UniProtKB/Swiss-Prot annotation:
Gene Ontology process terms (BP): mRNA catabolic process; RNA processing
Alphabetical list of SUPFAM superfamilies matching this protein: Eukaryotic type KH-domain (KH-domain type I), Nucleic acid-binding proteins, Polynucleotide phosphorylase/guanosine pentaphosphate synthase (PNPase/GPSI), domain 3, Ribonuclease PH domain 2-like, Ribosomal protein S5 domain 2-like
GO-annotated molecular function: 3'-5'-RNA exonuclease activity; magnesium ion binding; polyribonucleotide nucleotidyltransferase activity; RNA binding
Protein known as: Polyribonucleotide nucleotidyltransferase
PANTHER family reported for this sequence: POLYRIBONUCLEOTIDE NUCLEOTIDYLTRANSFERASE, POLYRIBONUCLEOTIDE NUCLEOTIDYLTRANSFERASE 1, MITOCHONDRIAL
Localization: Cytoplasm
Family: Belongs to the polyribonucleotide nucleotidyltransferase family.
Protein residues bound to Mg(2+): D489, D495
Residue ranges occupied by any S1 motif domain in the UniProt entry: 625-693
Function: Involved in mRNA degradation. Catalyzes the phosphorolysis of single-stranded polyribonucleotides processively in the 3'- to 5'-direction.
Name of a matching Pfam family: KH_1
Lineage, opening ranks: Bacteria, Pseudomonadati, Pseudomonadota, Gammaproteobacteria, Thiotrichales
């Protein structure tokens, strides 16, 4: 068993790549180590293309094993179940990073599995998994010539931090992941605290500069440990077939792409496709028999060439806009009467209905990871039903990877403006229902989430808007597109989503399909996105620019009290009897903590006010010189104990009672008396006198 090893340094941390010791039956197998973190990444490549495959079936699975952190899983079975959302997001991150490096038309199935075997809690293992995926591919024999690497960058006190640990990230204004080849940026994912575009661009370029070290190490490992290149074929469009279709139908296709409406355009294109199929099947084009798949792919290539050339020649886009124009926007809030907050955001043929729901601490999501269980106060969910694109399909199923990814992007875009628990004790769930989709539904979700939360009275620091940018590039000619359509995303070279406030960027997500994205293009895209974002924010601000001061009448009420910690036991009572009594009487939900914090959560203001008043009565402090109406709780030979407030009693001597002209033999437990607090000694004992009638 021969083991090959490569060692390099990344941000003052040593990283070790090793192959030959584990999972040797996989085509590629690499362990990546950093400190006490160990990630095993395997690659298996199918040697032939499955019948009927017309796409690249790449699948990436990132898995965390709880034993890696010395823990036993929760749940009845005590074993790992389906991957968490965080694991799915990391799988997507790796997929998006490596997919562009494969040749067009390569349809062999590839499966990559990254398994976290050991975890020390200091450094997130996602970048190690990404590096391992690239290394295992490089030695697998797959056609993976442009090796990819990825790094994380933080930003604190005006300085970029390479490969930050988790503590660094807690103090950082930026969490940026960049992946790419030696000469090209392929993928960007980030969350930021409203940073200027210049800082974001600087972070991307800083990250790319440090990819070379990783790529060189992977190349050295591949040079000594790589398996022979597999034999494979590349599917290519039949050029003669394409020319025949173009000669007969190009005019019709060109006219169809002057129709601005997506539905009408698709109806026209479907009719042309039908005619194309009939023409090819009924005529002997070149003596060959073509499949429907081959014909439609040639047709699609003509569409792609047409749309791209029109844009590069300065002609109007598919819907008639120029490169920088944003589609018409319509904003409404409070569209649903029975919810806590709602907004309907429509941009062209993309529409998001976003609803905000307020809850208590008990509604917070508990997220289990290798770091333990974390309480999540802000949840954002994204739903993409088939009717949003005029199709039939499965409804009510678990969210797909794409839905999870879009929800996460929208959440990261708005996380920077979300209030902390001290400022806003509610738990918040935002749900985006995509009602129509023709590009940039995730950015519509960002805009709608901001509007919906403000409608619900959530005190976000600033409104947030998002925009999706595109790119068409051919050699030195290029065009950056603002607010791209679905077709422009599909037929273009870049999908660059930018979200932020009027002050700066809160989230970036970029996927690039080609090489050679220059600094100039990135600068233009960021600046064009900034102008577009401010335009969108201006329209949103005309409807609502600050959160509502009060929550909706149908929203629950919450009140936070800070009392003397010693009084918590009085609020709770023996065996919880006191707090249970308050809950039963008022219907409120009450949570207490040893620090003295009491949270009262109620369905309406009346219920909350009643519960707060009862708690205030229990915890109120007796004061000297004050008169109280109390009840006798205990009779003694020399006097009585009178309950004043909550569990606070005072002693009333018979001498004081007789002095006030009342007979002591007539006193009974439960009898009401009006008493004056004469003094409170150092031990907290209260002496009373009777107020004369």
């Amino acid at each position: 068993m021969k083991i090959f090893r490569e060692v390099f340094e990344l941000g003052n941390k040593e990283i070790i790549l090793e192959t030959g010791g584990m999972a040797r039956q996989a085509d590629g197998s690499v362990t990546v180590s950093c400190g006490n973190n160990v990630v095993l990444v395997t690659t298996v490549v199918k040697k032939s293309v499955a019948d009927g495959t017309d796409f690249f079936p790449l699948s990436v699975h990132y898995l965390e094993k709880t034993y890696a952190a010395g823990k036993i899983p929760g749940g009845f079975l005590r074993r790992e179940g389906r991957p968490s959302e965080e694991q799915i997001l990391i799988s997507r991150l790796i997929d998006r990073s490596i997919r562009p490096s494969f040749p067009d038309g390569f349809f062999n199935e590839i499966q990559i599995v990254a398994t976290v075997l050991s975890y020390d809690g200091a450094v997130a293992p996602d970048i190690l998994a990404l590096i391992g995926a690239s290394a295992s591919l490089a030695i697998s024999g797959a056609p993976y010539d442009d090796v990819v690497a990825g790094v994380r960058v933080g930003y604190t006190n005006g300085k970029y931090i390479l490969n930050p640990n988790k503590q660094d990230l807690r103090d950082s204004d930026l969490d940026l992941v960049v992946s790419g080849t030696d000469d090209a940026i392929l993928m960007v994912e980030s969350e930021a605290n409203s940073l200027p575009e210049s800082v974001m661009l600087g972070g991307i370029l800083y990250a790319h500069k440090h990819l070379k070290t990783i790529i060189n190490s992977i190349n050295r490992l591949a040079k000594v440990a790589s398996k022979p290149r597999i034999e494979y074929s590349i599917y290519q469009i039949n050029k003669f077939l394409k020319s025949q279709i173009k000669s007969q139908f190009f005019g019709e296709i060109k006219n169809a792409y002057t129709i601005a409406s997506k539905q009408e355009r698709n109806l026209k294109l479907n009719a042309i496709r039908k005619n194309v199929l009939e023409y090819i099947f009924s005529s002997d084009v070149d003596g060959n028999e073509y499949t429907e798949k081959e014909i439609l792919e040639a047709f699609h290539d003509i569409e792609k060439d047409l749309v791209r050339s029109n844009i590069l020649e300065g002609k109007p886009r598919i819907d008639g806009r120029c490169t920088e124009t944003i589609r018409p926007i319509n904003v409404k809030i409070g569209v649903l009467p029975g919810v806590h907050g709602s907004a309907l955001f429509t941009r062209g043929e993309t529409q998001a209905l976003v609803v905000t729901t307020l809850g208590s601490d008990r509604d917070a999501q508990l997220v289990e990871s290798l770091d333990g269980i974390e309480k999540c106060r802000y949840m954002l969910h994204y739903n993409f039903p088939p009717y949003s694109v005029g199709e039939c399909g499965m409804v009510g199923m678990a969210p797909k990877r794409r839905e999870i990814g879009h929800a996460n992007l929208a959440k990261r875009a708005t996380q920077a403006v979300f209030p902390n628990e001290e400022a806003y004790p509610y738990v918040v769930r935002v749900v985006s229902e995509i009602l129509e989709s023709n590009g940039s539904s995730s950015m519509a979700t960002v805009c709608g989430s901001s509007l919906s939360m403000m409608d619900a009275g959530v005190p976000i620091a600033e409104p947030v808007a998002g925009i999706a940018m595109g790119l068409i590039k051919d050699g030195a000619k290029y065009a950056v597109l603002s607010d791209i359509l679905g077709d422009e995303d599909h037929l273009g070279d870049m999908d660059f989503k930018v979200a932020g406030t009027r002050y700066g960027v809160t989230a970036l997500q970029m996927d690039i399909k080609i090489k050679g994205i220059s600094r100039e293009i990135l600068e233009q895209a960021l600046e064009q996105a900034r102008v577009g974002r401010l335009h969108i924010l201006g329209i949103m601000n005309e409807v609502i620019k600050e959160h509502k001061e009060a929550v909706s009448d149908v929203a629950p009420q919450i009140h936070v009290m800070n009392i003397n910690p010693a009084k918590i036991k009085d609020v709770v009572g023996r065996g919880g009897a006191t707090v249970k009594g308050i809950v039963e009487k008022t219907g409120a939900q009450i949570d207490t903590s040893d620090s003295g914090e009491v949270k009262v959560f109620a369905k309406d203001k009346k219920s909350m006010d009643m519960a707060v008043a009862m708690i205030e009565e229990i915890v109120a402090e007796v004061e000297e010189g004050q008169v109280y109406k109390g009840k006798i709780v205990k009779l003694l030979d020399s006097g009585v104990f009178v309950n004043l407030l909550g569990s606070q009693d005072g002693y009333l001597p018979f001498s004081e009672i007789e002095q006030a002209g009342m007979k002591t033999n007539s006193l009974v437990e439960g009898q009401g008396l009006e008493v004056l607090v004469q003094n409170i000694d150092r031990g907290g004992r209260v002496k009373l006198s009777l107020v004369a009638r």
